[in-house]
């Protein structure tokens, strides 16, 4: 059997890029003399969320539980300060959008209440006011479960949410596992049935969700013209959204990059160059949990994780594409320059599933997990200046 499901097959073409010795030196990670180093987060921090209000960074949830922390970037010597605890249930993979000086936190994966017996795709929403240091649960629910979702804003007044798992299928998987109890045969059957499906059969969200806080209402921003993704990275450049990679089914990522431009009330999408391989001459498997942002009109993508060999198994007809494969965390940093991706340098360590916050012409990477899933508290700043990557 050669190829199954060609409509999902990623064209894993290899691109040979020759670098001179001088070019290799130029793309090496150099200290950024214009940036002040930020202190570590007080706790090992991964699968959380966060945002930036004026000159302060806010992060919380994930491995921090219900805790949230604030760093005044004008007074970094004071370190991270604890703010009010999140009033809802602990959760991972929530998303945050800053609108009119307030943090709006949506969804994630966790229990609906303290007595719940399993985790679920959550659809609730909360607002944090930095001026009063108070949280409020909003009287609304997202139209979809929000796990693996990404979120941003185009105008500072409304949130745009993209992608994520199908709540019924996701929740059902954990329900079925719980029902199997200690019966290993039943558990194995549940696991194989869940992972042994084509990408389209997971029904990842393709609806563009727009939340208007003034009306406390949700509306449609159109439909993605491609398979929904989970764990993508997202950046905003002017009035455009850049959606980068993500998984199209559990364990199988895509190298695709898309640009969304608001036309009227909907986003219209155009394909961008696929992300290149992590090494010269290698194919890109696609990334989930990567960091991204903009520096001097250049899109930067860093870290993330995948299962090398998953596409090879999938194209041989093995729908459980990552079965038997080892998850790999990455440290490469990519830059989109003149509409072409290049390998710009490397992070200090392999890293993914942290928080990306857009700074003034820099990308702030907060926390994340490194090889083996170990949480880190490090804060790293990336910028692109003079055709070079700078890391602080």
Swiss-Prot record:
Disulfide bonds: none annotated. Keywords: Carbohydrate metabolism, Isomerase, Kelch repeat, Periplasm, Repeat, Signal. Residues 1-35 form the signal peptide. Its EC number is 5.1.3.24. The active site is at residue 247. Its main location: periplasm. One of its GO terms (molecular function) is racemase and epimerase activity, acting on carbohydrates and derivatives. It is an enzyme of class 5 (isomerase). It catalyses: N-acetyl-alpha-neuraminate = N-acetyl-beta-neuraminate. Pfam families: NANM. The keyword Isomerase applies. It is found in: Periplasm. Kelch repeats lie at residues 56-100, 102-155, 157-192, 193-238, 241-290, 312-361, 363-392. The keyword Signal applies. GO terms for cellular component: periplasmic space. Belongs to the NanM family. Converts alpha-N-acetylneuranimic acid (Neu5Ac) to the beta-anomer, accelerating the equilibrium between the alpha- and beta-anomers. Probably facilitates sialidase-negative bacteria to compete successfully for limited amounts of extracellular Neu5Ac, which is likely taken up in the beta-anomer. In addition, the rapid removal of sialic acid from solution might be advantageous to the bacterium to damp down host responses. HAMAP family: NanM (MF_01195). Homodimer. NCBIfam families: muta_rot_YjhT, PRK14131.1. This is N-acetylneuraminate epimerase. It comes from Yersinia pestis. The lineage of its organism: Bacteria, Pseudomonadati, Pseudomonadota, Gammaproteobacteria, Enterobacterales. The gene is nanM.
